[in-house]
Swiss-Prot record:
Source organism: Bacillus mycoides (strain KBAB4) (Bacillus weihenstephanensis)
UniProt modified residues of type N6-(pyridoxal phosphate)lysine: 273
Gene Ontology molecular function, alphabetical: glycine binding; glycine dehydrogenase (decarboxylating) activity; pyridoxal phosphate binding
Stored Pfam families: GcvP2_C (PF21478), GDC-P (PF02347)
InterPro entries registered for this protein in UniProt: GcvPB, GDC-P_C, GDC-P_N, GDC_P, PyrdxlP-dep_Trfase, PyrdxlP-dep_Trfase_major, PyrdxlP-dep_Trfase_small
Known EC number: 1.4.4.2
One Gene Ontology term from the biological process aspect of the record: glycine decarboxylation via glycine cleavage system
Cofactor(s) needed by this chain: pyridoxal 5'-phosphate
Catalytic activity line of the entry: N(6)-[(R)-lipoyl]-L-lysyl-[glycine-cleavage complex H protein] + glycine + H(+) = N(6)-[(R)-S(8)-aminomethyldihydrolipoyl]-L-lysyl-[glycine-cleavage complex H protein] + CO2
Full protein name: Probable glycine dehydrogenase (decarboxylating) subunit 2
Xref: Gene3D superfamilies: 6.20.440.10, Aspartate Aminotransferase, domain 1, Type I PLP-dependent aspartate aminotransferase-like (Major domain)
Function: The glycine cleavage system catalyzes the degradation of glycine. The P protein binds the alpha-amino group of glycine through its pyridoxal phosphate cofactor; CO(2) is released and the remaining methylamine moiety is then transferred to the lipoamide cofactor of the H protein.
Keywords recorded for this protein, A-Z: Oxidoreductase, Pyridoxal phosphate
Length: 491
């Protein structure tokens, strides 16, 4: 069977074929009718695939070869920090004392796990400059929502019920206004200036007595450090608002600068990005939230505390916003992040930022002659290009991204941030070698030349992938959401 004709597992079924023989039943046999009501019992057998173990192995191995991950190739997805995840993290996460415990166990039986969580909180407090941290939130956007709910609780506790607006820059992550809306706020956009930074005059214009918070990423999504952050913090605080730090780009400032020292009141982190939890496949993530002292009473319960008798969860939190997740966060990702932090140490984390910034600036300068550079200045961990000159020749940024697939690269983030036309956002991370960067750069230059000399090659890409270009409009308007049974394929 050709690779492009890879069948679904349901299509390789052969009646009577089995993968395993089960041992004899060693407990009393029970009829389903004696356990479940008839409404919950199938009338007909489920149409499950009948395949051998070899069929299964070959099927899923073939599918895995179609996947692209950081272990298989360069993954320069801007604003996603697709760095290599050290495998020591996986070894530690599989320790029996971490992998084989249950969240409903008595606290006395999981003191080691609780100690790890407590120590991780302490490390994150030091890294961010916050006063305390909760590990409950499951991922970045969940952390955003949690942080905004804390800000809302703070204002309401102080009688400021009219603070209903959250300010976000025009370069913000899309989750920022979404999280604000879900938390019950109205979002107000502040413009960027010609340098790609928040326009201070526009910020002064939109800040008022209705301002609950300003949400920022620093460096911002253009990869630029908000150099006026202290003045911005003063503007917001003088108006009675809070400053929220989206930790998506923390990889750019590790051990170099701390959000708490910039004036931020709330911060969420992405342990699955900055601190090497594997991500990109839908989860799990971990989005701890750190706060300054005046927001501590509202943290979700329980909070993890250390006493002379060990570690325990404190549920006595009358002002807390409640729970934001069952139990206490995604523990497995927390173990991986803790392992990474302890392995790297302060000097190692500082080096992470130095190499991430160096790699990004190197790539930006090499690519600048071939693509438009909207903001011609040093970047931090990521940078944005524009495909405006290619668009004038009939080739879109989407076409460039598709062409990269032919060379085995995952495309960068495209069309984001929204305030850059034909945007291409590239984040190389610190874990990639110069040889890898040069290989990607060479292909980007090749594509730029193809646009000028043979644009059809780019417009019709990809050419070498199993699946060619999809009709994305048709897929959006007429999606096929259910499996449609076909005739069995002979293998």
């Amino acid at each position: 069977m050709k690779n492009q004709d890879q069948a679904l597992i349901f299509e390789v079924t052969k009646e009577g074929r089995v993968g395993y023989s089960l041992p004899k039943l060693d407990v009393e046999e029970v009829k389903l009718e004696d356990v479940f009501e008839s409404d919950y019992i199938r009338v007909e057998d489920a149409e499950l695939p009948e395949v051998s173990e070899l069929d299964i192995m070959r099927h899923y191995t073939a599918l895995s070869n179609r996947n692209h991950g950081v272990d298989s190739g360069f993954y320069p997805l801007g604003s996603c920090t697709m760095k290599y995840n050290p495998k020591i993290n996986e070894n530690v996460a599989r320790f029996a004392g971490f992998a084989n415990i249950h969240p409903l166990q008595d606290e006395k039986t999981v003191q080691g796990a609780m100690e790890l969580m407590y120590d991780l909180q302490e490390h994150l407090i030091e890294i961010t400059g916050m006063d305390t941290v909760t590990l409950q939130p499951a991922a970045g956007a969940h952390g955003e929502w949690t942080g905004l709910m804390l800000i809302r609780a703070y204002h309401e506790a102080n009688g400021d019920f009219n603070r209903t607006k959250v300010i976000v820059p025009d370069s913000a992550h899309g989750t920022n206004p979404a999280s604000a809306t879900v938390a019950g706020f109205e979002t107000i956009t502040v413009k960027s200036n010609e340098h790609g930074l928040v326009d201070l005059d526009d910020l002064k214009r939109v800040v008022n007595e209705e301002t609950a918070a300003l949400m920022l990423t620093n460096p911002n999504t253009l990869g630029l450090f908000e150099e006026n952050i202290l003045e911005m913090a003063e503007i917001v605080h003088n108006a009675g608002g809070k400053l929220y730090y989206d930790g998506a780009n923390l990889n750019a400032v590790l051990s170099q600068a701390r959000p708490g020292d910039m004036g931020f009141d709330v911060v969420h982190l992405n342990l699955h990005k900055t601190f090497t939890g594997p991500h990109g496949g839908g989860g799990p993530g971990s989005g701890p939230v750190g706060v300054k002292a005046d927001l501590i009473p509202y943290l979700p319960k329980p909070i993890l505390e250390k006493t002379e008798n060990g570690y325990h969860f404190n549920y006595d939190r009358p002002e807390a916003i409640g729970r934001v997740k069952p139990f206490y966060g995604n523990f497995g990702i927390n173990v991986r992040a803790y392992t990474y932090i302890r392995s790297m140490g302060p000097d190692g984390l500082r080096a992470v930022t130095e190499y991430a910034v160096l790699n990004a600036n190197y790539m930006m300068r090499r690519l600048a002659p071939f693509y438009d550079l909207p903001f011609d200045r040093h970047c931090k961990h990521e940078f944005v290009l524009s495909g405006r000159r290619q668009k004038k020749l009939g080739v879109r940024t989407l076409d460039i991204a598709k062409r990269l697939l032919d060379f085995g690269y995952h495309p960068p983030t495209i069309y984001f941030p929204l305030n850059v036309e034909e945007c291409i956002m590239i984040e190389p991370t610190e874990t990639e070698s110069k040889e890898t960067l040069d290989g990607f750069i060479d292909k980007m230059i090749q594509i730029a030349k193809e646009v000028e000399e043979n644009p059809e090659v780019v417009q019709e890409a990809p050419h070498t992938t199993v699946i060619k270009r999809l009709d994305e409009t048709l897929a959006a308007r007429k999606p096929v959401l259910r499996y449609e049974k076909l005739a069995p394929v002979q293998v």
